Swiss-Prot record:
It comes from the Eukaryota. It comes from Tamias striatus. GO terms for biological process: hydrogen peroxide catabolic process. The modification Phosphoserine is found at S3, S49, S102, S124, S138. This is Hemoglobin subunit alpha. PROSITE patterns: GLOBIN (PS01033). One of its GO terms (molecular function) is oxygen binding. The modification Phosphothreonine is found at T8, T108, T134, T137. The modification N6-acetyllysine is found at K16.
Length: 141
């Protein structure tokens, strides 16, 4: 459960991303593809080369979904229900991949905002991404 301090940290962290969410989302995807090559199997129709328009576009989708989640911290299951259905029933993404992408997002955010990436912010972001992952995999059961 996200505490009031976590919610404050998350909103502040997302505010600092400014217009870079899509850029960071794409960078996190590229990190994931490089570090965990098996994740590429879910994107057979994508050009997965550095800076590809398809990876950039999907990075934007990831960032938009997380921004939507941050705006609905008190109802993450409701806010992410359609996305959970999509990943569980249509795309059939292995749930472990959400954890892998979450890790790559944390690394990307820490690399770009080291001063703001305090232990408290890190813990709040980690808890948030774990909660989002849990919600996204809830329809698998």
């Amino acid at each position: 459960v996200l505490s009031p301090a976590d919610k404050t940290n998350l909103k502040a962290a997302w505010h600092k991303l400014g217009g870079h969410g899509g850029e960071y989302g794409a960078e996190a995807l590229e990190r994931m593809f490089a570090t965990f090559p098996t994740t590429k199997t879910y994107f057979p129709h994508f050009d997965l080369s550095h800076g590809s328009a398809q990876v950039q576009g999907h990075g934007e989708k990831v960032a938009d979904a997380l921004l939507h989640a941050v705006g609905n911290l008190d109802d993450l299951p409701g806010a992410l229900s359609a996305l959970s259905d999509l990943h569980a029933h249509k795309l059939r993404v292995d749930p472990v991949n959400f954890k892998l992408l979450s890790h790559c997002l944390l690394v990307t955010l820490a690399a770009h905002h080291p001063a703001e990436f305090t232990p408290a912010v890190h813990a709040s972001l980690d808890k948030f991404l774990a909660t989002v992952s849990t919600v996204l995999t809830s329809k698998y059961r």
